[in-house]
């Protein structure tokens, strides 16, 4: 019996667990339409702010041998642009599974106001609150401040009743996994997305003896193969600490079907692709779908649930 990638996530059924990562190939309606027409099981919009943002000066994204470095600074078309798109798509494609919608305000108040707009709208998809952008100068990553994270979630869940996930930065200490999981378990979160890019890396052009991205004197978020072990560790750490009702979306270092399998084995329910999607474009989803099926067939698995989260210890 051939492997099935059918994925149940919340109350939705997707053909496979593959998605784009917010920020990649989702800036415009054209790119979003291309995602919708691809073999991705689901897709997510660009992280939006209240108003349109140009982001950081270029060059701000560079592909490097094992991944990427970026300091985009949240360029986007503004929340109304993306909300109009998803509402129209709901109307014209009523039988499609839920769309993911990402927001990343510059302040608590901005996030609250955007989430109120989503709550008051007819959007019936899944919202992702990005608490982990490392590339806005002068703006720390919210999710490294545990008290502030709790303050935001307290305010959000006073009024937000639709499915909500949060995107987290990578953590590197067991105490931090424990603290953050303890906070998140207090709320009716739909999911946690781990990880955003590893913040403030530095990549050097030896020939020019210079950095390769302009913002922040060359410091930027690292993605791709460099971050896969960190991403897998975060997926596993939260999978084993969070309430079973809080699902995991695994992001970081996915280049092959084997990488997808590893994220699922660590406990992810869905996975998002960023760096490699930039390099290959939307045909990557067809390749990853095929390669994941090949891995599963070789191992004798017919469904993802047969192995998801069942990582063996020594």
Swiss-Prot record:
This is Dihydroorotate dehydrogenase (fumarate). InterPro entries: Aldolase_TIM (IPR013785), DHO_dehydrogenase (IPR050074), DHOD_1A (IPR033886), Dihydro_DH_chainA_dom2 (IPR023359), Dihydroorotate_DH_1 (IPR024920), Dihydroorotate_DH_1_2 (IPR012135), Dihydroorotate_DH_cat (IPR005720), Dihydroorotate_DH_CS (IPR001295). It catalyses: (S)-dihydroorotate + fumarate = orotate + succinate. It is found in: Cytoplasm. Pathway: Pyrimidine metabolism; UMP biosynthesis via de novo pathway. Keywords: Cytoplasm, Flavoprotein, FMN, Oxidoreductase, Pyrimidine biosynthesis. It holds the Pfam family DHO_dh. The keyword Nucleus does not apply. Belongs to the dihydroorotate dehydrogenase family. Type 1 subfamily. One of its GO terms (cellular component) is cytoplasm. GO terms for molecular function: dihydroorotate dehydrogenase (fumarate) activity. Its EC number is 1.3.98.1. Its main location: cytoplasm. FMN binds at residues 46-47, 130, 167, 195, 224, 252-253, 274-275. It comes from the Eukaryota. Disulfide bonds: none annotated. Substrate binds at residues 46, 70-74, 130, 196-197. It comes from Naumovozyma castellii. The active site is at residues 132-133. Its cofactor is FMN. GO terms for biological process: 'de novo' pyrimidine nucleobase biosynthetic process; 'de novo' UMP biosynthetic process. Binds 1 FMN per subunit. The lineage of its organism: Eukaryota, Fungi, Dikarya, Ascomycota, Saccharomycotina.
